[in-house]
Amino acid sequence: MEYIALTGIADSLIEVLKKHNLRTLEIRSPQNFVGVLGLNAGDSVLLTSTSLQDLTDGTQGLIAKVVQKQVSVHSVVSSNELYIEEREAMSARIQLECRCMARVRSVISNELGKPVKVDAREISCYEAR
């Protein structure tokens, strides 16, 4: 099945999601942010600790269902007598519900500025490799 993949997610966070079933993540990395923009409540997403550059066939991850999504903009203004500087940063918060473990069959799309898409299949906890 085809999924949007969020890469470089901390192993500890994936373990917490497995144990507690429902967690909210704040996504700030540009590539994962683009992926989250392509998700809606009810969609499934693949989370993996593997970096974007190392994502290949056989990579393992966790499939989770998106319960909620929220995109926000944070503005920071700093100034002195000479200038005023305003910076904005966008982030997304997604609430995820753990579904199952999965293994990537193939990477469909891995282009900069576009959601990372993979074809993955669910795996049981007894499947060895």
Predicted regions and their residues:
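Short beta-strand-centered aromatic/proline hotspots
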Residues: 55-74
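Short histidine-centered beta-strand/loop micro-motifs
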Residues: 17, 36-38, 55-58, 77
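Short coil-to-beta transition motif at edge beta-strands of beta-rich domains
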Residues: 36-53
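A generic structural signal for short beta-strands and their flanking turns/coil linkers
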Residues: 23, 41-43, 60-62, 92
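Compositionally biased, charged N-terminal/linker segments
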Residues: 1-41
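Contiguous surface segments at macromolecular interaction interfaces
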Residues: 61, 75-129
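Hydrophobic beta-strand residues in large extracellular and virion-surface proteins
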Residues: 4-6, 42-47, 66, 94-98
